[in-house]
Amino acid sequence: MKFWKSVVGKLWFTILSLVLIVLFILTVLLLEFIENYHVEEAENDLTQLANKVAVILENHEDQALARSITWELADNLTSIAIIQDEKNHWYSPNDKNRLSSITVEQIQHDKDLNKALKDHKKVSKRTGLSDTDTDNERLIVGVPYEKDGKKGMVFLSQSLLAVKDTTKHTTRYIFLAAGIAIVLTTFFAFFLSSRVTYPLRKMREGAQDLAKGKFDTKIPILTQDEIGELATAFNQMGRQLNFHINALNQEKEQLSNILSSMADGVITINIDGTILVTNPPAERFLQAWYYEQNMNIKEGDNLPPEAKELFQNAVSTEKEQMIEMTLQGRSWVLLMSPLYAESHVRGAVAVLRDMTEERRLDKLREDFIANVSHELRTPISMLQGYSEAIVDDIASSEEDRKEIAQIIYDESLRMGRLVNDLLDLARMESGHTGLHYEKINVNEFLEKIIRKFSGVAKEKNIALDHDISLTEEEFMFDEDKMEQVFTNLIDNALRHTSAGGSVSISVHSVKDGLKIDIKDSGSGIPEEDLPFIFERFYKADKARTRGRAGTGLGLAIVKNIVEAHNGSITVHSRIDKGTTFSFYIPTKR
């Protein structure tokens, strides 16, 4: 900052200017006063001397003696002229060599002096009268006198050189004093302005530090005046700012943590439609839309058209708006609420909820109800129909009655299995699966499973193979539950494998457990159905017959049993290539 633009420069210049103006006025007035004072003193002295001369001339009979006495009264700077008329006038000796000499001609040439001479009146005048030698400003005093009836005038002339010399010396001292005063004022003004502005500079530096976020900045308190109070208030302001900024940061961090931990997406939108704040779920939503629109994620700050229209409606109506939209195969519910700044809308906040799982569960629930209704209605209808046939004696022969009774028996068993499966699944999903761990010989266990299905495989012309590679023959698991797992998976593999196909069972020891693979060369499972294959009543083959369908609960039960053993199960499949179910059972510690 330039010196003249600084507070120091302005204060220094202001104080110095005021002092200079005051000194100038005082100097002018003082010089005028001193000069006038000296002139007035000289005039008074000269008037007294003129009166004394007039008295001497009036009181002495011997005028020549009186004049001699008068000449003695005059000093080197004073000249005396005694004039009775144009012919009778006398001058003090050596007047021609004096700067103050005066003649009748000079008096007659001056209007005021000539008038006083004619009227015999007192006169006092400051004037410059030219003679042959010099041009000098003088003080002339005229006093009338009268002797023996003869009137005359006594004129005293005195040069003002002495007065001017005195005034010059006085002026030098005054200017010297003024110069000293100016120098002292300069130093004093600079010192005062620097002392005043030092705390201000510190406050400026402190304000700059505050602007940079250094809220612990303190200003030194050097005085107890208004500037000291200002420094105290500044320090208090810094502490308050530090406190409030910390509180805001804590609230911001808390709000950020809340937003980040929310399962729902949150988007804060400015009044012009630009996005201000988002949380991770909302960012995933926007990224999915940017990807769908082939937009650069870094450059994208727009909303989907549906969300933008909802935002405009919320701002215009000042009411909450809600829509459901599908993006990248996922269902989203979008709730838009206006944000207010005092009395006007300043933007809106959008809450996004991923409803894909809910919609899937709704679909599964509907399918579950439909499947349960279907699975129960079919055997009940058959039981009712064949029972009516027996009651109405429609079966005429014993063979027909046995056939009807067998059908009723089979359907009742089927309905019982469905109910038992539902009860088992409900117990497993509620965490009440009771496992009875015991050491089982894996080879013997697997041989029993193979024998159980070998007849069915042979009947369907399907090759049933197995491969066992174990480090230990015995393993801890629930034999009944694990047999249920193998039964469900092998039964599914055989039912969905055509004649001439194959089903292989592989059991291998892995680190801390067993790895089992059940692979078939059947029809396979569509890729879009793989994520839901372990849901209750989910059927990948929607067109398969009841004979192949089973209850639709087998794989759900399998998954729950495996997970009850702290294991995991996966499935890999390709259409017309076959399916492989792989599950892992950890060693029981």
From Swiss-Prot:
Q: What is its EC number?
A: 2.7.13.3
Q: Which GO terms describe its biological process?
A: osmosensory signaling via phosphorelay pathway; regulation of DNA-templated transcription
- What domain of life does the native source organism fall in? Bacteria
For membrane topology, the record states: Multi-pass membrane protein
* Domain HAMP intervals: 194-246
So what does this thing catalyse?
A: ATP + protein L-histidine = ADP + protein N-phospho-L-histidine
Cited Gene3D superfamilies = 1.10.287.130, 6.10.340.10, Histidine kinase-like ATPase, C-terminal domain, PAS domain
Q: What is its main location?
A: membrane
Do you know which CDD domains this protein is assigned to? HAMP (cd06225), HATPase (cd00075), HisKA (cd00082), PAS (cd00130)
Q: Where is this protein found? A: Cell membrane; Membrane raft
What ranges does the Cytoplasmic topological domain annotation cover? Answer: 1-10, 194-589
Domain Histidine kinase residue range list: 371-589
Which residues get modified to Phosphohistidine?
Answer: 374
Which GO molecular function entries does the Swiss-Prot or TrEMBL record give?
ATP binding; phosphorelay response regulator activity; phosphorelay sensor kinase activity; protein kinase activator activity
State a GO cellular component annotated for this protein: membrane raft
Q: Where are the transmembrane segments?
A: 11-31, 173-193
Extracellular domain ranges by topology: 32-172
Alphabetically list the UniProt keywords: ATP-binding, Cell membrane, Kinase, Membrane, Nucleotide-binding, Phosphoprotein, Transferase, Transmembrane, Transmembrane helix, Two-component regulatory system
The record's subunit annotation is: Oligomerizes, probably forms homodimers. Interacts in vivo with FloT, colocalizes with FloT-only membrane rafts. Oligomerization is assisted by FloT. Another study shows only minor colocalization with FloT membrane assemblies.
Role according to the record: Member of the two-component regulatory system ResD/ResE involved in the global regulation of aerobic and anaerobic respiration. Probably phosphorylates ResD.
Q: Can you say what this protein is called?
A: Sensor histidine kinase ResE
Species assigned in the record? Bacillus subtilis (strain 168)
Gene coding for it: resE
